[in-house]
Amino acid sequence: MKKIILAISFLFVFMVCAFAQASDFQRAVGHFKGHAATATATRTTHKAALAKDATAQGTLTMSQPAQVEIAIDGGKDALLMEGSTFTMTVKGKKHVTTSQQNPQFATFQKVFEAILAGGTQDIAALKEVSVKKDGKQLVLTITPEAADKKQQRRMMFSSFVLTIDAATSQLRSLRMNEKAGNYTDYTFTNFQFK
């Protein structure tokens, strides 16, 4: 009997925590519903083997239903998510994949679709996502899980960290962590809803 009561108590606490996280997320991204957004983007590329980080300027454009573009140096370098299609442009050369071909982007896609929908899509059920409230900011960490060792070796990123201003719904940063301590960090300023 004690085990049953303990199990029910644990389940209740888990449900309350999941509901609280979903509620925090919905409040934090509520301004996106029905709006597009733009911002100035600053990219910082950190390579553990190099002494100095490289920085560059660009723009962030987000529009519904599922388009997110970060263009750096006039589009010479860019990240574009259009639904399930992901395009990375590096020095003018395009690399295209989809969330079906490259599963590490599937949860990333679902999270951004939920953000652009103003929080109406539930992310609480996504096991690869953790949501943490840090003062006035909401921090979403997406840690893709590989199905096997081969897929894990092919993964470009070990995690994605999104920081959202909980009061204004403004996306503050996106950090894409790579292997061996390398990362690319995008910080966003002059955020505007349209």
Question: What are these regions, as identified by a protein language model?
Answer:
Residues 94-137:
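Flexible, surface-exposed loop/linker segments and immediately adjacent secondary-structure boundaries
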Residues 16-56, 63, 67:
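N-terminal leader/targeting segments and the immediate start of mature chains
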Residues 1-4:
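Positively charged n-region of N-terminal signal peptides that target proteins for export
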Residues 42-48, 71-73, 89-91, 176-179:
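A generic structural motif
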